[in-house]
Amino acid sequence: MNTEATHDQNEALTTGARLRNAREQLGLSQQAVAERLCLKVSTVRDIEEDKAPADLASTFLRGYIRSYARLVHIPEEELLPGLEKQAPLRAAKVAPMQSFSLGKRRKKRDGWLMTFTWLVLFVVIGLSGAWWWQDHKAQQEEITTMADQSSAELSSNSEQGQSVPLNTSTTTDPATTSTPPASVDTTATNTQTPAVTAPAPAVDPQQNAVVSPSQANVDTAATPVPTAATTPDGAAPLPTDQAGVTTPVADPNALVMNFTADCWLEVTDATGKKLFSGMQRKDGNLNLTGQAPYKLKIGAPAAVQIQYQGKPVDLSRFIRTNQVARLTLNAEQSPAQ
């Protein structure tokens, strides 16, 4: 009868109350139990008050209660019904697994981003190429325009030079002009002969065409007495002209250009006179003289080597940019754009 009453009384007590009673019967304090079980005093107190700490997993709580029961000599089988109520097993929360479609969606998004990046890169490259081509085309058109202008100027100058009328009525055959001087004095004939024949190699056909009428007029109009007197005066300037042609004075402002490839250029001196304007072929050279400073326009700077006052002119900055060179050669040989 007493055993059944004790069993009913134990069932009425909770797990925490039974552990507390057993501890008190053994004369142990909560501090002593906590030290033996290596727990906090607050944890022992929560177990005796049938509290389940929120920050403590149910598995650990059940283990602490079993250790506490062994310490105070209470069979674990008697505490199992109370453990189910005080520390029920909680289902572990499992994070939902990401589906394969999410990875495919992210991969698709990365693919679109990469496609957009490549598209932007191609657009930038295309715009850069278009800008370079337009600049190159503009330079070529400018060179072509300058070449056409120079060709038109040269053609107009040549037409003006060809339209000058020549007075052919005064030019006579050398055979007819040489016949009348037969009656002229011997000394006059001897002085005229070297004066006319000596400069012949040094002058061009145009000069011969101009000199011949005057010579014919002098021969036909000469009389024995005045011819001997006028012949030395007329013959004296000829050696002077010949000396001026054969021994030119070197100009310190001479501009020398050697060409390694076909190149268009235009050279103007300080007076605005165009010393040259047109196309120069490969292996050609120019030696120009005028009044400094010179203004130069060069279509292909890499194809020409310039010397001014005996010193080379640096065109590297125009060669690097591959542009039409516009520069001015001052008297101090300091090219300025």
UniProtKB/Swiss-Prot annotation:
The keyword Membrane applies. Residues 145-218 are annotated as: Disordered. The chain crosses the membrane at residues 112-132. One of its GO terms (cellular component) is plasma membrane. One of its GO terms (biological process) is regulation of cell shape. Residues 1-111 are cytoplasmic. It comes from the Bacteria. PROSITE patterns: HTH_CROC1 (PS50943). Its main location: membrane. Residues 133-337 are periplasmic. It holds the Pfam family RodZ_C. Residues 19-71 form the HTH cro/C1-type domain. SMART domains: HTH_XRE. It is a single-pass type II membrane protein. Residues 168-207 have a biased composition (Low complexity). Keywords: Cell inner membrane, Cell membrane, Cell shape, DNA-binding, Membrane, Signal-anchor, Transmembrane, Transmembrane helix. It is found in: Cell inner membrane. InterPro entries: Bact_Cytoskel_RodZ (IPR050400), Cro/C1-type_HTH (IPR001387), Lambda_DNA-bd_dom_sf (IPR010982), RodZ (IPR023690), RodZ-like_C (IPR025194). GO terms for molecular function: DNA binding. Residues 145-167, 208-218 have a biased composition (Polar residues). CDD domains: HTH_XRE. Cytoskeletal protein that is involved in cell-shape control through regulation of the length of the long axis. Belongs to the RodZ family. The helix-turn-helix (HTH) motif in the cytoplasmic domain of the N-terminus is involved in the formation of spirals to maintain the rigid rod shape. As this protein is anchored in the cytoplasmic membrane, the HTH motif may contribute to protein-protein interactions to form the RodZ helix, which is localized beneath the cytoplasmic membrane. The C-terminal domain may be critical for determination of the rod shape by probably interacting with enzymes required for synthesis of the peptidoglycan layer, including PBPs in the periplasm. This is Cytoskeleton protein RodZ. The lineage of its organism: Bacteria, Pseudomonadati, Pseudomonadota, Gammaproteobacteria, Enterobacterales.
